[in-house]
Amino acid sequence: MRGIRKAFGATQALDDVWLDVLPGEVHALIGDNGAGKSTLMKILSGATQADRGQIWIDGQSFEPHDPRHGRKAGVAMIYQELSLAPHLSIEENILLGIEPSKGPFLQWDEIHKRAGAAMRQLGLNHQAPSTRVATLSIAEQQLVELARAVAVGCRVLVLDEPTSSLSRTDIERLFSLIGELRDRGYAVVYISHFLEEVKEVADRFNGLRDG
């Protein structure tokens, strides 16, 4: 990301921000609430458009118009407020909107296969794919969100304050999983305002203050 600027009315949220994130690393963004961390990542994922600046992914210029476009280019952002459908199963949530079909019919064998592969990568294979998401813990629901991103081929995973609702045990499991994703070549962007967490999980970090 090069020279990113974003204003909301008279408030300058981001002012000439530069950021490099590499494959196979956990890169943290740290700063107080309102520093611009989430806004910067919303621009990367397509949820918000920059006023000025450039984004490059794998050497290609990238101008995301919306989150669907961002995911198609390989970028997924997991928010504090999860966007799952609680009445649907784990596997239905993982492939929601991208269900393999033939004509008007869903290909359930392919759904089971693809969802199962994503669940194994994210350590969810102890759960039945048919389990309703509403019955899962917050930590497990977070993993379903990550599995959804992995299933569509995203290689840049943005986690926005992911530990805010987790116990210490769940945090340790999440950090272990983040390390596994890094070792598989994923670029993980970790947004936090807790310096101790950043020291524990990140390979590099950038600080933001007032954009």
Q: Where do the language-model regions lie?
A:
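Glycine-rich phosphate-binding loops of nucleotide-dependent enzymes
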Residues: 1-211
